[in-house]
Amino acid sequence: MSQLPAVSSAPQTGAASRDRRLPQAEVGGGRRALPGPARPGETRGRPMAAAREGPAAPAAAARGGRVAAAREGRAAAARGGPGAAPRGGAAAREGPAAAAASREARMAEVARLLGDPLEEEAPEGRPRSRAGGLAAMPYMRFRHPLSVLGINYQQFLRHYLENYPIAPGRIQELEERRRRFVEACRAREAAFDIEYLRNPQRVDFDILTFTIALTASEVINPLIEELGCDKFIHRE
């Protein structure tokens, strides 16, 4: 009677160990059946299957990778398309605006470098705009090029007259010659008008005489010599 529990316990231990060695599988997920030892037939068949699939396996894998990448690219484009279009439109709108702002800034800088108009050069009754940019351009009058050197036209003329004292005399002499020439022309014209009233048939001859007298007058000859044009005139 005392050995019955021992005898009855031995088969239970063996059954439990056999149950642990057997592959277990549960319905609805859980531990799956553990792979058992490979059979001799399967071991011999694996190298042959690998040899048959060897050339085609990399190509199939590459095709599968490309197909998957193409599907992922289309999906990403479909997801980002509606959002990317507004972003692209905003960038396209910001491009001209940024270019216009940069151009206006450059023009304002050029206006600042050229300087504001002098107080005495400002037009009367016209508002003076001190704001930078394109708003100041219509009312801005550029300075004389001599202002780049830091002097104005009056200072330059004074400097020229002080360093070249002969210049005023030459200018006055030329002005006097011009005045005498104009007066002589008016006098000759009046004389020819009177002569035309007396004898209209002599008009052509008088015109020729006037031309000869004009080119040989004491007013023109010194002026021609002064300007250096006498060397280009063939005199007989």
Curated annotation (Swiss-Prot):
Omega-N-methylarginine: modified positions: 63, 79
Keywords of this protein's UniProt record, alphabetized?
Coiled coil, Developmental protein, Differentiation, Methylation, Myogenesis, Nucleus, Repressor, Transcription, Transcription regulation
* A single GO BP: regulation of cell population proliferation
GO MF terms held by the record? SMAD binding
Q: Where is this region: Disordered?
A: 1-102
Query: Which cellular compartments is it found in?
Result: Nucleus
Q: Which stretches are tagged as biased composition: Low complexity? A: 32-68, 75-102
Residue ranges, compositional bias (Polar residues): 1-15
Parts forming coiled coils: 170-190
Principal place of residence: nucleus
Q: Which residues cross the membrane?
A: none
**Looking at the UniProt record for this protein, which Gene Ontology cellular component terms does it annotate, in alphabetical order?**
nucleoplasm; nucleus
Signal peptide interval: none
Its quaternary structure? Answer: Heterodimer with EID2B. Interacts with the C-terminus of EP300. Interacts with HDAC1 and HDAC2. Interacts with SMAD2, SMAD4 and with the MH2 domain of SMAD3.
What does the comment on domains in this protein's record state? The N-terminal portion of EID2 is required for nuclear localization.
The name this protein carries in UniProt is EP300-interacting inhibitor of differentiation 2
Say which species the protein is native to.
Mus musculus
